[in-house]
């Protein structure tokens, strides 16, 4: 089972539909009013990477200090985990 913070990271990556940097994930967490700390989100991201739900895409991201940083995306296992947690959605 996933922790609350892990679910937040999975949801943010799923909603974005593109690879994100840590800073982008932190900004989206603030906008969604998740009460996670930046370090907590980073820790959960690494846990999800180790479990095979998230992977590092490339180092083409740029952070606020204009340095290159990793971008992360969901693996197939990560997408399956989201669909198992929330079920299939149908468009009307």
Region locations from a protein language model:
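Short, amphipathic alpha-helical interaction segments positioned at domain boundaries
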Residues: 70-92
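DNA-binding alpha-helical recognition surfaces that contact promoter or target DNA
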Residues: 11, 27, 43
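Short acidic, hydrophobic short linear motifs in intrinsically disordered regions
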Residues: 19-30
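Short, Lys/Arg-rich nucleic-acid/phosphate-binding segment
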Residues: 58-69
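A short, conserved structural fragment
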Residues: 49-60
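Short alpha-helical segments that sit at the start of domains
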Residues: 1-16
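Short amphipathic alpha-helical interaction segments
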Residues: 35-50
